[in-house]
Amino acid sequence: MSLTGCLPPRPPCSMRRRTSGGGASVSPVVVMASTAGVGGIGNPTPRGKKPFAPWREVPPQVTHTLPPEKKEVFDSLEGWAADTILPYLKPVEESWQPQDHLPDPRSPSFGDEVAALRERAAGLPDDHLVCLVGDMVTEEALPTYQTMLNTMDGGVRDETGAGGSAWAVWTRAWAAEENRHGDLMNKYLYLTGRVDMRQVEKTIQYLIGSGMDPRTENDPYMGFIYTTFQERATSISHGNTARHAGRHGDAALARVCGTVAADEKRHEAAYAAIVAKLFEVDPDYTVRAFARMMRRKVAMPARLMYDGADDRLFARFAAVAQRLGVYTAADYAGIIEFLVARWGVPGLAAGLSGEGRRAQDFVCSLGPRFRRMEERAQEAAKRAPPAAAAPFSWIHGRQVQL
């Protein structure tokens, strides 16, 4: 899971309690950044003095909104998940490993292979390196994402750390597959000699220490919608990075990014299947959860990215990705439209309450609305002066146009 962010500016979420939804509470924990728009650098709050705290703060977050009776839904789907979702995982012995894509240190030609890798990587522009590093850093924050899945209510979390439920097995095995992504990209970038690995490693440590808040309220309906969206977005991002690498003459890097993108696509299919099943068995609550998730907008998992100096690092990384077409506001709109169609939201009829029908209308309107916003933003960008450049510590402080 990795992503840049490209959403229109959104004011901070205020503290609020729900009057429906099974004992919602407001958490005092400060864990994530407010949304920053692509094309701008954001407006971050200065870093506080607390050690290991996120570098900018947000209001307290709503937690535990899932009605207690909804646990029965996931209990009833345990067998279905074992039969339908676990087969999306690949056996370890049949899975690719990072070493399959890297020079073999046991080989007498190891030095020559590394030299060839470095020669290919020498042609990668700095802005492409920024996107590659940003994606890799996000992949390396995997402990945060597994933790996030295990905060969900409804009986889907891994209660013991080695639980035997299909939901627990999926979470651990999914994380094990995802773990290879950051490993591979990290080692590849190290071998290129093009980036400041100490700065990259600091960024990873800061990001894992800061955590994230996907605004899913510990609700697995919202959580699985969020993960479906993120996996699809990640597949798009890595796929576009692969195409950029190929155009700049690094076919090996293109294969690396393409391999990661294929994994993300498979994981997307699994999470999308879970949500499709929820639409089948509980359409009213599921469409309302979809609308709640989209009203908050999908907060990107690396939004608290920080390298120890640049308070605007994530916004700048996202701006570069938008400019290069690695992940854009148009992609965000396209994902909404795809998921609305994938889950048959326009055709929902039976079983919807008045609130459910309003949620249906809202969700179905989002894709076209975001596309219109993106078109206006593109027109404004054409009339605007060239974007400023900013230094990135990942590439030894060199300037990259935003």
Curated annotation (Swiss-Prot):
Chief subcellular location: plastid
Cofactor note: Binds 2 Fe(2+) ions per subunit.
Chain residues that bind Fe cation 1: 139, 178, 181, 264
Record region (Disordered): 1-25, 38-66
Transit peptide location: 1-32
Binding sites annotated in the UniProt record for Fe cation 2: 178, 231, 264, 267
Disulfide bonds: none
InterPro entries noted in UniProt: Fatty_acid_desaturase-2 (IPR005067), Ferritin-like_SF (IPR009078), RNR-like (IPR012348)
Cofactor(s) of this protein: Fe(2+)
One annotated Gene Ontology cellular component of this protein: chloroplast stroma
Entry keywords, A to Z: Chloroplast, Fatty acid biosynthesis, Fatty acid metabolism, Iron, Lipid biosynthesis, Lipid metabolism, Metal-binding, Oxidoreductase, Plastid, Transit peptide
Gene Ontology molecular-function annotations: metal ion binding; stearoyl-[ACP] desaturase activity
Protein's recorded name: Acyl-[acyl-carrier-protein] desaturase 3, chloroplastic
Organism: Oryza sativa subsp. indica
